[in-house]
UniProtKB/Swiss-Prot annotation:
This is T-complex protein 1 subunit alpha. It is an enzyme of class 3 (hydrolase). GO terms for molecular function: ATP binding. It comes from Mesocricetus auratus. It is found in: Cytoplasm, Cytosol; Cytoplasm, Cytoskeleton, Microtubule organizing center, Centrosome.
Length: 123
């Protein structure tokens, strides 16, 4: 776990660059996983433990936005929803801006699957 991970609501900064996950406990790790998960494999013998933490982190996170154009797709959906609260001219401008983000997410065919998955999750 990165030393700047948020653990139990406070920013945990240690002078050590590697924190032993056994010292933290399951609840602290799940709280950290809610905000983001970063795993550095330092001991390949502990793959079962790493698998457990990845599964626990995945269960703690309510939604996952994959990479590959997902940020543009998420922003497009957010802007489309926001546009409905605006007046007519502003709504048209924001909707067009949202369409531009959506088109950018669909440009690269390699990213199409990840983008479609992100749209399904976010809607």
């Amino acid at each position: 776990i990165h030393p700047t991970s948020v653990i139990s609501g406070y920013r945990y900064i240690s002078e050590n660059l590697i924190i032993n996950t056994d010292e933290l406990g399951r609840d602290c790790l799940i709280n950290a996983a809610k905000l983001g998960v970063q795993v550095v494999i330092t001991d390949p013998e502990k793959l079962d433990q790493i698998r457990y933490f990845v599964e626990a982190g995945a269960m703690a996170v309510r939604s996952v936005v994959p990479g590959g154009g997902a940020v543009e797709a998420a922003l497009s959906i957010y802007l489309e929803n926001y546009a409905t609260s605006m007046g007519s001219r502003e709504q048209l401008a924001i909707a067009e801006f949202a369409r531009a983000f959506h088109n950018e997410a669909q440009v690269n065919p390699e990213r199409k699957f990840a983008t479609e998955a992100a749209i399904t999750i976010l809607r």
